[in-house]
Amino acid sequence: MEANVFRFRDARSAPDPVLEAGPVAFGSQPVPLVLDNGSFQARAGWACPGPDPGPEPRLQFRAVCARGRGGARGGPGPQVGNALGSLEPLRWMLRSPFDRNVPVNLELQELLLDYSFQHLGVSSQGCVDHPIVLTEAVCNPLYSRQMMSELLFECYRIPKVAYGIDSLFSFYHNVPKNALSSGLIISSGYQCTHILPVLEGRLDAKNCKRINLGGSQAAGYLQRLLQLKYPGHLAAITLSRMEEILQEHSYIAEDYGAELQKWQCPDYYENNVHKMQLPFSSKLLGSTLTAEEKQERRQQQLRRLQELNARRREEKLQLDQERLERLLYVQELLEEGQMDQFHKALIELNMDSPEELQSYIQKLTLAVEQAKQKILQAEASLEVDVVDSKPETPDLEPLEPTMEDVENISDFEPLFSEETPEVEKPQVTTVQPVFNLAAYHQLSVGTERIRAPEIIFQPSLIGEEQAGIAETLHFVLDRYPKAIQDTLVQNVFLTGGNVMYPGMKARVEKELLEMRPFQSSFQVQLASNPVLDAWYGARDWALDHLEDSGAWVTRKDYEEKGGEYLKEHCASNTYVPIRLPKQASRASETQTSGRGSSASGSGAG
C-alpha cells in the first residue's frame, strides 16, 4: 500500500463489563462517584483516596441510546453507549438526552445513569449511597439543573451532589492548587465552543461567550464536502468515518490563506494528500463461478424459497386455527342457549345470522384441512432436482477436406519452399487496459484536512453568522482594563476534545500576537489530556473538598431551597436564584378595593 493511503478503522465498541466496586469504594465513608456528563462521551469512575487514585475513568461510552422494537413485548430493551457496537446501522434510531450541551430529556439521562451505576458495581439497595460530582454546561439553565437534582435525589436518593463545569475542572487539574489562578479558558467540545475568563480562581460568568460550533458541525461539514466530491460513494461517507478523519488526519493551519496557496502546487498536493481507502470487493459476481457452483447456488435459493413458503403456510394455518376455535366457541354458545352472549359475539364478528356463522365455519375448516395437506406434501418433497435448462449442443459434423482442396494446396507448395526466406511481420504490441479497482474506492482528502476544523475560526465557511475564536477572544479581552488583560493572557488555557488538532496552539498564539500590543507577552497552554482532564480535575476536586460542606448540595438543601440551588466553588457556575415578582398582599388589595367603592358611593350621592 502507498505511503499516503490509509484504511478506515471502522472501530466497533465492545460492550462494557459489569465491574465490581471492590473494597476501595467502601471505606470509613462512601467514596464519591465522578461523572463527566459530556454530550459526546460520558465518563464515570471512582474518586478513590490514596497515593494512586487510578489511571483513568473506568467507564467511557458514547452518550447515546437506542430503543429496540418490541421492548414492551419482551423484546430487547434500550441499548446504551458501547452496547450498541457500530453506530452507523442504528444512526436513525439513536437518541441523545442533550440539546446542544444541555440535558433536556431526563428519561434518556436516567438510562445513562442506570448504565453507569450498574457497570460501576454500585450495589447499595434502593439508593446510590455515594456523593456524586457531576459536570454541567456553562451557564446551565436553572430548569435543567432542577430536573437533574430531582432525578438524583428522588430517584437515586443520593446523599449529596456537587455540580461543576468540565473545562473549569480541567483548568483545576492543570494549574497549581496553591494559588488563586487567573486565566482565559478556550474550551471547544462536540457541540459548542466557550471563552471563559477566570479571575482569582472564580469564573467571571458575566463576560463568558459561547460559539455554537464544535466537533459535530465540523464532521457534518466534512461529510457534505466529500459527498459532493464523490457522489458515487454517498452511502460509504458516514459520520463515524468523518469523525475518524477529523481526529487522525486533520490539522489547524497557522495561516489559512497561505496554506491554501500551498495546496495549489501539484507536488505539495501529491505529498500531503491523504487517500482514504473504502472497503470493496474485488471479486466480480458471476465471473468466476463454475457450473457446479451455479447449480449449488440455485439449489440453495430453491431450498430457501421452500422454507420461506413453508413458514408462511404454518403461520397462516395457525391464524386460521385460532379463528376457527373462536368461531366454534361462538357456536357452542348457541347450542348451550346463551343467546345474549351469542348475539354479542356475532356483532363482534360482523355477522348477521347463525347460518352465516355455520357457512364460515365450514369454509374455514376446509381451508385448514387443505393447508395441512399442503404442508405434508411440502415436507415430503423437500428434495427437488434442479434441472439445468441449457439446451444440448448437437454434435458437430466431421469436417473432411476434399481432394480438390488438397490439389489446390499442392499447386502453391513450390512458392513456399525451405529456401524461401520468411517475410518478417511487424511486431504489434497490444496494450491491455488496466483498471485499478482499489483506486476507484479511495477518497482523496486534500484541502478538506484544514477546511473542516477551520470553522471554529471562520464560522462563515458553513454560513453561520457568528464570530470565530479570534474575534470572540478579542471581544472578551476588550471588556477588561489593561492590567487585567495582561493577567489573563499570561494563562490562556486550551481544553476540550475539539482542540486536539495539530497546530491548534500555534494558531491561537498567532491570533494573540496579532491582537495584543507590540512586544507584549502572553502564554498559551494546552491541557495535558484535553479529553480526560475534565474527569481528572473533578476527581481531584472531590478528594480535596470531600469534607467541605460549603461545596456540596445535600438532600436537606434540595428540600429547603429547591432543585435549582447551587453551592458555588472554584469550578462551578455562578448561582443566580429565581427572582419572582412580588405580589401585592391581600390587605393592600382589600384597602384598594374599599377606597374604590367608597369613592364610587360618594360620587353617586
Curated annotation (Swiss-Prot):
Its main location: nucleus. There is a cross-link at K283 (Glycyl lysine isopeptide (Lys-Gly) (interchain with G-Cter in SUMO2)). GO terms for cellular component: Ino80 complex. The keyword Ubl conjugation applies. One of its GO terms (biological process) is telomere maintenance. It is found in: Nucleus. Keywords: Coiled coil, DNA damage, DNA recombination, DNA repair, Isopeptide bond, Nucleus, Transcription, Transcription regulation, Ubl conjugation. Residues 593-605 have a biased composition (Low complexity). Residues 287-328, 355-384 form a coiled coil. Residues 581-605 are annotated as: Disordered. PROSITE patterns: ACTINS_2. InterPro entries: Actin, Actin_CS, ATPase_NBD. Gene3D superfamilies: 3.30.420.40, Actin, Chain A, domain 4. Belongs to the actin family. ARP5 subfamily. Component of the chromatin remodeling INO80 complex; specifically part of a complex module associated with the helicase ATP-binding domain and helicase C-terminal of INO80. Proposed core component of the chromatin remodeling INO80 complex which is involved in transcriptional regulation, DNA replication and probably DNA repair. Involved in DNA double-strand break repair and UV-damage excision repair. This is Actin-related protein 5. It comes from Mus musculus.
